[in-house]
A protein has these predicted regions:
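N-terminal leader/linker segments that initiate helical-solenoid repeat arrays
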Residues: 16, 22-81, 88, 329-332
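Start-of-helix register in tetratricopeptide repeats
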Residues: 43, 77, 111-112, 146, ...
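Conserved structural position within tetratricopeptide repeats
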Residues: 67-70, 101-104, 135-139, 169-173, ...
Length: 332
């Protein structure tokens, strides 16, 4: 089972934070019902675990934490760090088990790593459990942005798009509507197969942030996927190029759009030429330039560029290029 892999530094910081937390809790022994002697033993093993970790001695740190577990088997924090350490030494099933125990002992605080393990498992059954966990956590922590974001991701992992949008609504109440909110909603609608709503979400955000280049790029992507009218796509490409006149993909795609819709071929050639000057071995750019030359009757020059495009093309790029190649080279 795949679990988030922690670096040594991350584990150390977690231990240090936990150790400081325990040291600072004067009522800790009373809270857990431990005697002073047992509390001292517990702290001794926590410090020993930290020292072992300082020297990258994971096995020794693990042994010390297991003593802590024996002294207080109901301590969720100990269970969570045992999960982290078992993961560090590649004992994934034990790691998952301890993270699960930590969550069950303290669901309001020990849900994050357990949720990450469930999410990364890639297993449908575990993803269903993740959604149940996420729903429980937001009831326990209704003002926690991370908890609502976890529910959003859990819902998406289960293809529950309605729940994902509800979680995003709650996130927006907590932190306001912004670019991240718009992007999250856009992705949900795309995943749900609702391109019109995805486009509407992008346009909603652009209404308040009209200079955001990335969202204009999102807009034209969804327009092309929807086979939107030529003039609509053209207007979006023009806006993109106003914001970034040297955006190569936009130059190439706008040039090709003009070519296949009977637009201004001189303008298309000029834009396409700029892309191959910047990236002379880019198969996609070469293909576009060759096709525009062909449409203008310049097949001799077009042949040179389409041959170069085919030589440089990756396997997944070849289908469209081969079609153009056969037409330009007049092959059957």
């Amino acid at each position: 089972m795949a679990i988030y892999k922690f670096t040594y530094l991350q584990i150390y910081k977690l231990f240090l934070a936990a150790w400081l937390l325990l040291v600072g809790q004067g009522a800790w022994a009373v809270e857990y019902g431990l005697s002073t002697e047992r509390e001292q033993q517990f702290m001794y093993h926590w410090v020993a675990a930290r020292d072992a970790l300082d020297h990258s001695q994971y096995d020794a740190a693990l042994a010390q934490l297991l003593f802590c577990e024996q002294l207080n088997p109901q301590d969720a924090l100990t269970k969570e760090y045992l999960g982290v350490l078992y993961n560090a030494i590649n004992q994934k099933e034990k790691a998952f088990g301890y993270l699960q125990q930590a969550y069950r002992l303290d669901p309001a605080k020990r849900w994050y790593l357990y949720s990450a393990a469930l999410y990364k498992s890639g297993d449908k059954k575990q993803h269903k459990t993740l959604l149940q966990v996420a729903k429980r956590v937001v009831k326990l922590q209704p003002k926690d942005e991370d908890a609502w974001n976890n529910l959003r991701q859990a819902a998406l992992a289960n293809d529950d798009y309605k729940q994902a949008l509800k979680a995003q609504d709650e996130l927006d109440k907590l932190r306001g509507y912004d670019g991240l909110s718009a992007l999250n909603r856009y992705r949900v609608y795309v995943m749900a197969g609702k391109p019109k709503k995805a486009l509407a979400e992008i346009e909603r955000y652009l209404a308040q942030d009209s200079l955001n280049l990335q969202f204009w790029l999102f807009k034209v992507q969804i327009q092309e996927a929807m086979h939107a009218p030529f003039r609509d796509c053209e207007a979006t490409y023009r806006q993109i190029l106003r914001l970034d006149p040297n955006h190569l993909s936009a130059l190439n795609n706008y040039a090709y759009l003009l070519a296949i819709h009977g637009g201004d071929l001189r303008l298309a050639e000029s834009m396409s030429q700029r892309t191959i000057q910047a990236q002379p071995d880019n198969a996609t750019f070469l293909d576009t330039y060759a096709w525009i030359l062909h449409l203008q009757g310049q097949d001799y020059l077009a042949a040179f560029y389409i041959q170069k495009a085919l030589r440089n093309a990756a396997e997944e790029e070849k289908e469209e290029i081969v079609k153009h190649y056969k037409i330009i080279m007049k092959e059957p």
